[in-house]
Amino acid sequence: MSSLLKTDFNVSKYRLIAQKREANAVEIEAALEVVREFIIKKKLILYGGIAIDYALHLKGSSIYPEGERPDFDMFSPNHVEDAYELADILYEKGFKQVGTVRAIHVQTMRVRTDFVWVADLSYMPPNIFDTIPTLTYKNLKIIHPDYQRAGLHLAFCFPFDNPPREDVFSRFKKDLQRYNLIEKYYPIPVVPVKSTYESKTFSIPFKQVAIHGFAAYALLYQTLNELRITCKVPEWKTEFPQPSYSYHKNDKNITLTVDMPRAYPALVLATYNPEGVIKEMGLHLTEICEPYMDYSPPIFKTNDIHFFSTMFKELAISIIQDNLIVVSPQYLLLYFLYGAFATPADKSLFLFYYNATLWILEKADSLLNIIQKQTSPEEFTRFANTSPFVLTTRVLSCSQERCTFSPAYRISLANDVQQSQLPLPKTHFLSNSLPDISTLPYNYYPGKGKEKPTNFNYEKNLLFNIGGKCTPSAM
């Protein structure tokens, strides 16, 4: 019997060959050079895979093969007008079939020529754009890897986002590889920060919410310590915080006592129904904060508890001691990065806790290796599936109207409603959650003779209020 020839599955190699042999390869390369010059001129900030690749080039590494066609993703504080301007430039230079269209990600505009995408421009509010850390590679501004980490953690926090290509299938492996490279070449230095603590007691429902923030760190640390004792490993010497907690429960609530930093004494909870939980708990809403890009959701603040809204999302969670629902370590890491970005005065504190959480995961991994050697594969799999220290697809259960319905889905539904001229029934679970599509950016095609849309109003559409601004509540 003849043996089969060995197949070369080097995808990158064949992608390069395919790009070079495309009929319009020369035109695409020329268009990308125009885009590159535009990015430099407008001082826009590259992000995504290309930013990671360029940052790694500065360290002698990469994620893409040499010569691969760049995929330009960029942030702009005026992305709609910039996208229109780039389309005009390409059209004036003689490129064909030029157009700018709204992407699936609502804050992104895509520019194409000859039906090939050459640029994605995403909105970043000026207050963030002007302060975000960057590096420079060949005259191009790229987002600093410290900020890029946040986007990589994000996919692990919401495993069922972006259906039908859910992140658990399409992003987990790729983002983990990229994160490990960033951690290797751009580690965040450990700078100890001394904090004073106070013991705080909170009464919270044991359904609909997940413990987050500094309290979640305390729960994860003590769970790690209990696992260390079980594995009979000597106590570690560490400079990282070692807060403690205790709790008891009744039929409806959990009373949690936990060591909290005096600078941040409020308990943070994640929930898909913040206003409902606040009402159920009899609390008074004092302040509402808009999202901070994709990295922090709307925050509903009361005097002692801050609620991170995960409405329309399914948040990855863990269960500790069969009773306590806690956010995944990935969401906690994202929280500490968000804190470092949004509150520069306490950046060192949040980054210290970020590194402390990484340390917890590192030590947990060493303990899991011990357990794996001492148990059967079946027993270890069962144990790992309930561990709070591993990537998980267990999510905070939610009612139908508050599950995974992305802005893209709701915009698509709003388009269908507009075209059919038939409103959703008032009883439909999304009847009060459809965006006003008349306030979204318009597509633009320079060669079709239609007048270019002007003066897009970012403040008029809530989907673009993503600068983290907080306002007192009228409630």
Curated annotation (Swiss-Prot):
One of its GO terms (biological process) is mRNA processing. CDD domains: polyA_pol_Asfar. GO terms for molecular function: ATP binding; poly(A) RNA polymerase activity. Its EC number is 2.7.7.19. It comes from the Viruses. Its main location: virion. It catalyses: RNA(n) + ATP = RNA(n)-3'-adenine ribonucleotide + diphosphate. The keyword Nucleotide-binding applies. Induction: Expressed in the late phase of the viral replicative cycle. Pfam families: Poly_A_pol_cat (PF19244). Keywords: ATP-binding, Late protein, mRNA processing, Nucleotide-binding, Transcription, Transferase, Virion. GO terms for cellular component: virion component. It is found in: Virion. The keyword Glycoprotein does not apply. Polymerase that creates the 3'-poly(A) tail of mRNA's. Belongs to the poxviridae poly(A) polymerase catalytic subunit family. Highly divergent. This is Putative poly(A) polymerase catalytic subunit. The lineage of its organism: Viruses, Varidnaviria, Bamfordvirae, Nucleocytoviricota, Pokkesviricetes.
